Amino acid sequence: NWPVILPLGVLEYHGEHLAVGMDTLAVTRVLDRLEREADIVILPPFYYGASSHAVAGPVGNGTVDVPADRLLPFAQSLFASLLKIGFRNVHGFIHHQTENFAAGMPTDLAFKLAARQAIFAFLEQERGEGWWGDEKMADYYAKQAESADPFNWIQVHPLLNAAAIKQFPFDHAGEGETSLMLELCPEGVDMGRFSAKQWFTRTAKQASAATGRRGVD
């Protein structure tokens, strides 16, 4: 029952010095390293999340924004297919907007809801209506405590959890994300194009691969 990993991300403007795929590249590069140490299946990455145009408009900046309500049916169909294959240990990882992961942001919320809906539909199809109320499920809460809950078959996680974020300069295209890219994907960084015109990029000059390594570790 190897873990099946789905890298989730967006294409979003990250200043002039970082690749627009930064949020996704951070996830895929971390998973590349994890794959050397653990038995996992990595699915092709999904780049087209709900980036929004909060940072910058799309013209000349490369941001691609797919609304969450469009992501939901796609994600539900994808998860349904993975369940039909037989996977029961599916994990999505996302970096975009995860400083608000506990409350949720459009992309991760869409995939979380899709996971629940896909599991509900799968269980009802496989076990019939009333499956949870059946006498066979009398030990549901005991099994849930033992991590046998079917709603754990698909989970979505932040690349950096809350504890890691407290220890790392989490930001958008500043020291933190630029450092992550210097460590994980240096070809996606061009400090020769750096501009301090935007407030969110100004700390990028302080970035280093060593700081990025601390975030990855």
Predicted regions and their residues:
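Extended, histidine- and acidic-residue-enriched regions that form the cofactor-binding/catalytic faces
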Residues: N1-D217
